[in-house]
């Protein structure tokens, strides 16, 4: 499927050049001139023939440091300085990055998008970016062409993406993770981290391409973590994909907890939240208990690599995207992906929910870390009749019964809480810390229990 997508994208790129205007003059009948000058032309000294321009395929196949000749179209330039200019170029069969091309200030002014140029230089590579170095050029009169952006969102994380290196591309539905100015304040490059499907990617606002006075520079500077954006730019490479952004459109933002709760089932949701605990990782999935200062959420079987699962800590900040769902009264996020935001943590204190037992107010705290004090043990029952699976715990308070659970994927049989609960007797008094899970009614998942003497 990915190979099919890559093939279709290549076709789209070629078609995007089909509309390029040609301004070549019509051919003249030169038969007479040829016949009349046959003798003369055969006696002339013929100079070195003009080297034919390479195709993009031939350029990519050329050895590093070898001389190359290409004809291509200017798409954008970085700032001219010291008789040099760096140019982003593209042709119907591929794109090029021309680093510090020799160029007068007068010619730099003519380097407008669509202009055709013939370039002679040397093929080089720097940090994965294939480029033309030590180049010279001449303008080629005739056709002009401006590339349309090719959407390569589906190629993120694949080996096919690099085949589009330096092309003018677009990415849709990207989530903002981080915005960082190169020197800590506006004026220099902006390093942008965006996420898609649980993976992060580096982008850059290159100040010599789109400087501090441009709209894109200003817009990127105002982005907030969790914003959803569509991006266009040149598919530059720096130790991995590092697109140079030329435009950004904000299409959404991370939800508040109130907006998440109000969202209808099957609605796509994006939240910034903090992981407080998780069930056992398996089959590249993990179930998370999360809470911020605003409220809590339960993320069911989010896509997650083992490496990411092992990196989670109590309070880790994540950006999660998935779909709102309700199962047996439990609001949860399903079919989710998430990205860990490094260096930020939040762990709330448990709130004492004892006084809310039996009230309608309890559900407003669904999935939060809660404390229940002075609860009396009524019954302990193993799910399958013996230790190893979940433990169903019935606790009473003021004559009413409430169902709790020791969820084995949260607190396994070898954990202290599992052992402690298994040793309880009817009539024991306990204080309980739990996540306020719901199953047809309040059914908290216990993660700590304290017998009261």
Residue ranges: model-predicted function:
Residues 1-9, 21:
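Positively charged n-region of N-terminal signal peptides that target proteins for export
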Residues 5, 14, 45-46:
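Short hydrophobic transmembrane-like helices used for membrane targeting/insertion
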Residues 18-28:
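Bacterial lipoprotein signal-peptidase II cleavage site
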Residues 26-49:
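Intrinsically disordered, low-complexity serine/threonine-rich repeat tracts
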Residues 45-453:
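OB-fold single-stranded nucleic acid-binding module
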């Amino acid at each position: 499927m990915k190979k099919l997508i890559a093939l279709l994208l290549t076709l789209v790129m070629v078609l995007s050049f089909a509309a390029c205007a040609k301004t070549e003059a019509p051919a003249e009948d030169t038969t007479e001139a040829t016949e009349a000058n046959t003798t003369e032309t055969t006696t002339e000294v013929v100079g070195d023939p003009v080297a034919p321009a390479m195709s993009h395929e031939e350029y990519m196949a050329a050895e590093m440091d070898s001389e190359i000749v290409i004809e291509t179209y200017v798409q954008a330039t970085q700032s001219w300085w010291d008789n040099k200019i760096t140019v982003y170029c593209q042709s119907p069969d591929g794109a090029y990055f021309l680093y510090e091309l020799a160029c007068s200030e007068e010619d730099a002014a003519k380097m407008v998008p669509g202009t055709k140029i013939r370039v002679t230089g040397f093929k080089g590579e720097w940090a994965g970016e294939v480029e033309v170095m030590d180049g010279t050029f001449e303008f080629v009169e005739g056709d002009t062409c401006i590339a349309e952006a090719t959407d390569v969102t589906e190629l993120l994380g694949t080996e096919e993406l690099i085949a589009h290196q330096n092309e003018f591309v677009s990415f849709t539905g990207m989530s903002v993770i981080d915005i960082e100015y190169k020197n800590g304040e506006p004026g220099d490059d902006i390093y942008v981290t965006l996420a898609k499907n649980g993976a992060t990617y580096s982008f850059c606002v290159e100040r010599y391409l789109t400087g501090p006075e441009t709209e894109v520079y200003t817009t990127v500077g105002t982005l907030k973590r969790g914003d959803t954006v569509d991006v266009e730019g040149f598919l530059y490479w720096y130790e991995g994909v590092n697109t140079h952004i030329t435009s950004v459109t904000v299409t959404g933002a991370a939800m508040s907890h109130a907006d998440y709760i109000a969202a209808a089932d099957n609605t796509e949701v994006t939240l910034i939240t903090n992981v407080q605990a998780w069930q056992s990782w398996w089959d590249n999935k993990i179930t998370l208990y999360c809470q911020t200062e605003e409220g809590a959420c339960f993320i069911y079987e989010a896509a997650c690599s083992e490496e990411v699962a092992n990196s989670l800590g109590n309070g880790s900040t994540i950006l999660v995207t998935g779909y709102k769902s309700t199962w047996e009264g439990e609001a949860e996020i399903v079919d989710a992906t998430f990205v860990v935001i490094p260096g930020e943590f939040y762990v709330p204190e448990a709130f004492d929910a004892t006084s809310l037992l039996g009230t309608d107010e309890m559900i407003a705290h669904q999935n939060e870390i809660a404390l229940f004090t002075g609860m009396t043990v009524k019954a302990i029952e193993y799910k399958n009749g013996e230790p190893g699976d979940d433990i169903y715990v019935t606790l009473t308070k003021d004559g009413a019964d409430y169902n709790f659970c020791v969820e084995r994927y949260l607190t396994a049989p070898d954990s202290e809480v599992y052992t402690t609960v298994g040793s309880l007797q009817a009539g024991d008094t306990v204080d309980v810390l739990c996540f306020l899970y719901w199953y047809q009614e309040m059914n908290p998942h216990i993660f700590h229990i304290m017998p009261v003497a």
